Amino acid sequence: MFRQRSIQNLVRTIGVGVHSGRRVELTLRPAEANTGIVFHRVDLPQVVDLPASAIGVGDTRMASVLQQGNVRVSTVEHLMSALAGLGIDNLHVDLTAEEVPIMDGSAATFVYLLRSAGIVEQNAPKRFIRVLKPIEVREGEGRNEKWARLEPHEGFALAFSIDFRHPAIDSTANFAEIDFATHSYVREIARARTFGFVNEVEALRSMGLARGGSLDNAIVMDEFRVLNSDGLRYDDEFVKHKILDAIGDLYLLGKPLVARYVAYKSGHALNNQLARALLEQQDAWELVTYESQAEAPQAFRHEWKLA
């Protein structure tokens, strides 16, 4: 059967929260089959557990934030994206502050940590959410219109369009499509960094956001150009980072999707609305397992081969 996965060994790192600016220690621990991804705020007098869940998202301003009462775990999307990309179903995530560290602004460090810990298969079938009919969410009109859609597809593919009307972004691709039957998450998506604009920093920081942002963990632009001395990692890094985010946001559904995701100018809020809309329309999806890897769509066999 196509099996669930966790990691073999504990692994930890230290970083800074991109929004809080606070130092945080991140520990990734193996978890039993059928546990799911569970975040633990170990810095509190009594540890609070926050399972990764689309319905557990309480804030989507510039990040996906899990919330349980007054307890938060912010900026989970890059780690969730790496877990989706490597096919990891079960994991304990210990944090000593309210935000997952930003590392270099991409998912690459998390991929490295997870691979370093060793990926192991477990004696339980991996369950997938197969989309049976299109689900779409929209907001705004005219120039402000944005939308996201899930549609049936035997595999996992994403197509994303952006429109920032900024010279540094417009000089790169504003559209990318990735089908994991033929593309690699690790090589083509994981290294794409988050990005921001110098002229927005002051306003964001006044809202308690972007306090840990820097050229070390984001692509930063002024009115005309990219300020990072090393330039871009991919010619289409901006739109690929939006795909990276979407993969992480959708993995908050708790299981890998058998579907195609198509979006125009979507972000964390719309991605979460889409995930919730899918869960609410129960005739639009089904849970499936595969008796063997050969039965599963190529998209999952291609990327998830154990080293």
UniProtKB/Swiss-Prot annotation:
Taxonomic lineage of this organism?
Bacteria, Pseudomonadati, Pseudomonadota, Betaproteobacteria, Burkholderiales
Known function: Catalyzes the hydrolysis of UDP-3-O-myristoyl-N-acetylglucosamine to form UDP-3-O-myristoylglucosamine and acetate, the committed step in lipid A biosynthesis.
Reactions catalysed, semicolon-separated, are: a UDP-3-O-[(3R)-3-hydroxyacyl]-N-acetyl-alpha-D-glucosamine + H2O = a UDP-3-O-[(3R)-3-hydroxyacyl]-alpha-D-glucosamine + acetate
Q: Which InterPro entries does the record cross-reference, listed alphabetically? A: Ribosomal_Su5_D2-typ_SF, UDP-acyl_GlcNac_deAcase, UDP-acyl_GlcNac_deAcase_C, UDP-acyl_N-AcGlcN_deAcase_N
Coiled-coil residues: none
Q: Where does Zn(2+) bind?
A: H78, H241, D245
Organism name = Bordetella pertussis (strain Tohama I / ATCC BAA-589 / NCTC 13251)
Cross-referenced NCBIfam families: lpxC
What is the protein name for this chain? UDP-3-O-acyl-N-acetylglucosamine deacetylase
Which Gene Ontology BP annotations are present?
lipid A biosynthetic process
Q: Which gene encodes it?
A: lpxC
Record-stated family = Belongs to the LpxC family.
One GO term describing the cellular component: membrane
According to the UniProt entry, what is the EC number of this protein? 3.5.1.108
Pfam families attached here? LpxC
Q: One GO molecular-function annotation for this sequence?
A: metal ion binding
